[in-house]
Structures are given as C-alpha cells and as structure tokens.
Amino acid sequence: MKFFNREKEINKILSIIEGEPNNIYFIYGSLNSGKSTLMREIVVNRLDISKYIPFFIDFRTRNILNVDNFIECLFEVDEKSEIDDFREYAKSLADLLVKGSEEISKYYLGMPIKIPKPFFDKIFNKKDKSADVYQYIEYLFAKLNEKGKKPILIFDELQMIKEITLNGNRKLLWSLFQFLVALTKVQHLCHVFCLSSDSLFIEYVYKTGELEGRADYILVDDFDKQTALKFIDFLAKEILNKKLPKDEKELIYSYVGGKPVLIIKVIDKLRYENLNDILDFMLKDATQKLKYFLNDLDYIKPKVEVGDEVIELKKEDIVKALKLFKDSYEISDSEVAKPIYVYLVKKNILFLNPIEGILKPQSFLIWNAIKRLL
C-alpha cells in the first residue's frame, strides 16, 4: 500500500536531519498512530542516501531482559569476518557504505549496526560491555563523517530497556543517553531519533533534568478529522476500488476517529462485510473489554508506584476519572490524580501527552466505549 500523508512530520524530520546534530529527538504518540511507519518511509523513500546512512534498532524484535539482549539488538553480526580489531573493521565498513553501489546502500538502509564476530564475541566475555559497544559505534560514526556521510540512529520502542541495569545498579538507559548526548550535542556525529508508544516513558524522560536542553519532542498523533476522511477516500480507492458516500465516511470517523490502523481495518473488512455490522462489532468488542476491566476492580486492589510510594487505588476513583471523558475527548492531566492516570495509561485506556499536559483515550473506539458504558 502507498504511504499516505504525514508530509508535515516528514518535512520537519528531514529539516532536522539537514541541520547539525544537536539534540536527541523523541517521537511519541498514542498506540498505532504510525510512528514506525513514518520513520521507515523516511528511511526507505525520502532520504538522500548519498549523504546519510540510517541504522534502525527495533527493540520489539527481542525480549530485552539484560544488557546482552540490548547488545544483540544493536548489532547485526558479520559471521564471515575474522577481524577482531574494531577500528580496522569500522574503516572497511565505512568504505563499503560510502563507496558501495546503490544496491549495497539500499541493502543497508535501516539495518542494525554491522559488527565483526570476533569483536562481538570479545565484548560478551567482558564484565563491562557497554564501554566497548559505545567505543565501536563512536569510531564507526566518526569514520562515516570523515567520508561525508552522516549516520542516523533510530531506536524503536526504546522504553523496553528502561529497567535494565549495568554493573553497580546504574541504569542502562541513562548510560545510553549520556552516550547519545556525546554523539549529538558534543561531537555532532549523528542524528538520533527515539520512538515510543509508552507515554509514561516520555513523561519520565521529559521531567528528568538530565536531558534538559539536550532533547526535543515530536508528536505523531492520530489523524485529525479532515485528514482521516481523506485517508478513508485513499483506502477506499486502493482496497475497494470505489468511493464511499459522505455519510459512510462520517460514520466511520465517528466510531474509530483518526486511528490509521482502525480505519484500515474497517475499509479492509468492507470487502466482505456490511459497514454497520463492522462498526457495531468493533464498538461492542471495545465496550466488553472495558466492562471486564472495570468488573475486575471489584475483586482486585490495583497498586501503582509514584516515586518511592506504592499507592492503592479504588474502583470508584477510576470510574470517576473515566466519566470525565463522557463530554470531552481531551482533558487536562491536572483533572485526574496522578496514580489514577498512571494506572489507566499502563492499561492502554488513556494516552498522556506530557508536553501539552493532556489526557485522552487511546482511541475514539475506547472513547465511545467509555460513553456507552458509563
């Protein structure tokens, strides 16, 4: 399927890439709003590959339990290489990426970072692995810069390493951030983009002073109504080879809003189902899930951590918070006690935009379920 829209976000990110690296950029938004799709579109179709070489690290591909898993995600091991001197290998890899054919350049687009097996094995035999990892990446990126190519480092779902610790209980995440600050603001060696659907993680990063003045944030949200209706037109032509009437498009939007993945689901099902049946089932499904979630609160006492405190929640307070959305899709985060919204965000019922201080349901579908049930 052809890529649709997002020109505003694409132009912003391309403008950032054209400048000197100075910040770590966090790309955030609600679940399935299209963050990864956007970055892959930029990497594959919008970059000038004569100037840039992107490395795409997807933490969803592995179960990240420790530093070893983190390192395995960062690199693609060159099993054929017998080079154990990382400097020698980095020079040859930089030459390949800069002087190689267009086919080679396209092959490496958006892959993890290549590393020789002997050096990779050597890293795993050390107690402090992160130092060698960072040293290799820094050296490779410096060589690419010398040869006129700017690396772009992309981390997808970075929050998955949040709880991993290094030796001495130091957080891997903050060790990585220090390294990324060195690569961007200090040495200007590469651009860094961190993608996350976990809005509590974005809040955690945003309010922590260690990245003050070193990070910026880009929201990739669900489509607004006008764009959503155009997306419906686009999909109807691509999938159904026809145009939907205005009332049907309005009906689709009223149920699922501008969530791209849900709009795609509706249009695809229209190949073999009636529109009203599709939408009624989707809303019934979302309502049932919300009902079961609330019913469980009659038997459990959920607890959340806020700072060093563990706070027990009451069902009536959770229901009261959800009822605030009966008349508004968005509310200020100050209207809901933090322990309550933390719990509802963790359960993927609400989305928090910490930069704007806004809470809203993860989707129109959940919003409609709230209004129907409460």
Curated annotation (Swiss-Prot):
Q: Which InterPro entries match?
A: Archaeal_ATPase_domain (IPR051667), ATPase_dom (IPR011579), MJ1010-like_2nd (IPR049081), P-loop_NTPase (IPR027417), WH-like_DNA-bd_sf (IPR036388)
Q: Which Pfam families match?
A: ATPase_2 (PF01637), MJ1010-like_2nd (PF21690)
- Name the SUPFAM superfamilies for this protein: P-loop containing nucleoside triphosphate hydrolases
**TM annotation in the entry:** none
List the keywords (alphabetical).
ATP-binding, Nucleotide-binding
Q: Does the keyword Nucleotide-binding apply?
A: yes
User: GO: which molecular function terms?
Assistant: ATP binding
Q: Which residues bind ATP?
A: G29, S30, L31, N32, S33, G34, K35, S36
Which family does the record assign? Answer: Belongs to the archaeal ATPase family.
Q: What is this protein called?
A: Uncharacterized ATP-binding protein MJ1609
- Record organism: Methanocaldococcus jannaschii (strain ATCC 43067 / DSM 2661 / JAL-1 / JCM 10045 / NBRC 100440)
